[in-house]
Amino acid sequence: NAEPDVLTSGKSLGGGKASISAYTCKEKIFKKSYDNLRDATLHSTTFNALGEETMTAIEAINIIIEDNYLKKSKEIFNILNPGLIELKKKYPNIISDVRGSGSLNGIVINTDFTDKYFLPLIKLIPSQFTKDDYAFKKIVVSSIISELYDTHKILTFYGSNIDLPLKISAPIITKKEYIDYFLSSLDKTLSMGLIKLITKFIKK
């Protein structure tokens, strides 16, 4: 139930048409930061006050409110998150954490392999990739992404933070049967085991 003092937004604010972002904060924060001649323009940008982008953003906000995107994202979360938690219980050696809120969720994949399994696989990886400190972690997550796409036609991606979570970004129009299909497909994919998934991915 945290209430932020500062909120930034972008991407969907442009309604898929305009490039626009916004910075919103509480009045007391705004006054403390900008309510003087020296700092009054600190929050401005080179490209601002463009009428078409502003109108697009206003209409995007209207649609978000009128179509109740918040309710829809919560409905997605209430199906997807428990399903991911169940998969974590089923595959505790593969999924180390479940994260997210609304329609954006993710699972952290355990990449803590022993040398017994790691060393034979590392020999299959092209040398230019092994210079990246996160190379093996990326390959592990990418092997799951690849299988989900090739076999089940599901597009996922990994995040950019240190844990490189497998991100599931469900469209707001997603129906329950699609979420169920995703969870079933992820279950089938993880049941193959990471060693088989990684070997298949590297060979491909």
What are these regions (language model features)?
Residues 1-204:
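Conserved N-terminal phosphate-binding loop of PLP-dependent enzymes in the Aspartate aminotransferase
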